[in-house]
């Protein structure tokens, strides 16, 4: 079972529907015990970093996420979740979770696309990924696939963690992580077949990791 973290920040239901479409057992929860028992955790979200951090702290879920990371449970951050796994955000000058080294910055005003046309903020719509390093989440997905983005801020994790980049006004990290902890700036649950395949790959990684842990006992 995958746990979808519920901290009143938006798109948990769309993630659940995507997983249910795949036949993946899942539950939306704010219960730390359910997080601990899950094969993996999805940390989605839309909204502002400061408000999200307040909501996490009020529910004790900031500590729960740190426990998930320390236990080595598979974890997937999506959009706002991707951003606040880092140490800080320029949005609300927020101190964020600090599970992953890096910062979140706002897109510059008056950006331009490569063809000279305006690149308004927020970045909203479909865009592709440029793979930087191999990632099991992208297995079986056409490299030309596009994913759905909605964001005004972009992430700058430790460069060694960058798995894919996207270009919109500037080139930014759109997928980062390693060893079962990943984060996507785009919305896989809203990205059609490529996004569903990514979520399915995450579940398969979680399932195999759980089986390996049981066999090791």
UniProtKB/Swiss-Prot annotation:
<dbReference type="Pfam" id="PF00117">
    <property type="entry name" value="GATase"/>
</dbReference>
<keyword id="KW-0315">Glutamine amidotransferase</keyword>
<dbReference type="GO" id="GO:0004359">
    <property type="term" value="F:glutaminase activity"/>
</dbReference>
<feature type="active site" description="Nucleophile">
    <location>
        <position position="79"/>
    </location>
</feature>
<keyword id="KW-0963">Cytoplasm</keyword>
<dbReference type="InterPro" id="IPR029062">
    <property type="entry name" value="Class_I_gatase-like"/>
</dbReference>
<comment type="function">
    <text>IGPS catalyzes the conversion of PRFAR and glutamine to IGP, AICAR and glutamate. The HisH subunit catalyzes the hydrolysis of glutamine to glutamate and ammonia as part of the synthesis of IGP and AICAR. The resulting ammonia molecule is channeled to the active site of HisF.</text>
</comment>
<feature type="domain" description="Glutamine amidotransferase type-1">
    <location>
        <begin position="1"/>
        <end position="212"/>
    </location>
</feature>
<keyword id="KW-0456">Lyase</keyword>
<dbReference type="GO" id="GO:0000105">
    <property type="term" value="P:L-histidine biosynthetic process"/>
</dbReference>
<dbReference type="InterPro" id="IPR010139">
    <property type="entry name" value="Imidazole-glycPsynth_HisH"/>
</dbReference>
<dbReference type="GO" id="GO:0016829">
    <property type="term" value="F:lyase activity"/>
</dbReference>
<protein>
    <recommendedName>
        <fullName>Imidazole glycerol phosphate synthase subunit HisH</fullName>
        <ecNumber>4.3.2.10</ecNumber>
        <ecNumber>3.5.1.2</ecNumber>
    </recommendedName>
</protein>
<comment type="subunit">
    <text>Heterodimer of HisH and HisF.</text>
</comment>
<dbReference type="InterPro" id="IPR017926">
    <property type="entry name" value="GATASE"/>
</dbReference>
<dbReference type="GO" id="GO:0000107">
    <property type="term" value="F:imidazoleglycerol-phosphate synthase activity"/>
</dbReference>
<keyword id="KW-0378">Hydrolase</keyword>
<feature type="active site">
    <location>
        <position position="189"/>
    </location>
</feature>
<feature type="active site">
    <location>
        <position position="187"/>
    </location>
</feature>
<keyword id="KW-0028">Amino-acid biosynthesis</keyword>
<keyword id="KW-0368">Histidine biosynthesis</keyword>
<comment type="pathway">
    <text>Amino-acid biosynthesis; L-histidine biosynthesis; L-histidine from 5-phospho-alpha-D-ribose 1-diphosphate: step 5/9.</text>
</comment>
<dbReference type="GO" id="GO:0005737">
    <property type="term" value="C:cytoplasm"/>
</dbReference>
């Amino acid at each position: 079972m995958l746990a979808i973290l519920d901290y009143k920040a938006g798109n948990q239901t769309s993630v659940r529907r995507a997983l249910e479409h795949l036949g993946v057992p899942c539950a939306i929860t704010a219960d730390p015990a359910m997080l601990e028992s899950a094969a993996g955790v999805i940390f989605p979200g839309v909204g502002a970093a400061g408000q999200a951090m307040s909501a996490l702290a009020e529910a004790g879920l900031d500590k729960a996420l740190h426990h998930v990371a320390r236990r080595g449970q598979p974890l997937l951050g999506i959009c706002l979740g991707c951003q606040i796994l880092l140490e800080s955000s320029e949005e609300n000058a927020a101190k964020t979770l600090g599970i992953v080294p890096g910062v979140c910055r706002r897109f510059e005003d008056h950006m331009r696309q490569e063809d000279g046309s305006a690149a308004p903020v927020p970045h909203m719509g479909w865009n592709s990924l440029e793979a930087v390093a191999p990632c099991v989440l992208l297995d079986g997905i056409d490299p030309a696939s596009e994913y759905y983005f909605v964001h005004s801020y972009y992430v700058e994790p430790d460069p060694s963690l960058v798995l894919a980049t996207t270009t919109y006004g500037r080139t930014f990290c759109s997928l980062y992580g390693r060893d079962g902890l990943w984060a996507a700036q785009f919305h896989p649950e809203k990205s059609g077949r490529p996004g569903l395949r990514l979520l399915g790959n995450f579940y398969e990684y979680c399932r195999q990791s759980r089986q390996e842990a049981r066999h090791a006992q």
